[in-house]
Amino acid sequence: MPILGLGTWQAPPGKVEKAIKLDYLDLYLIHFPMGFKVIPSNTDIRDTWEGMEDLVDAGLVKYTSLIEDPXVKKIADKYNKEYPFHVDY
């Protein structure tokens, strides 16, 4: 799978789907929701989660998931009201 969407930038609409040659993903996963070095960023994890929910609404993703971060799970529990998700750590 091509490395697209990693970091704090966004891929243009359609770029990922074209690169992986699929119409949708079964699972969109945030494995480790932070960088390995400190980079100033105003990106809020809630914005990231809402973007993932938008992908579910658009039919591009069936499920979302978080792994290895109990703090992110707390945020997802608070803000995720409509979509099932899985957290494993």
UniProtKB/Swiss-Prot annotation:
GO-annotated molecular function: oxidoreductase activity; structural constituent of eye lens
Key words, A-Z: Eye lens protein
UniProt xrefs under InterPro entries: AKR, NADP_OxRdtase_dom, NADP_OxRdtase_dom_sf
Secreted in keyword set: no
List of residues binding substrate: H31
Assembly information from the UniProt record: Monomer.
Assigned protein family: Belongs to the aldo/keto reductase family.
Name used for this protein in its record: Rho beta-crystallin
Organism: Lepidodactylus lugubris
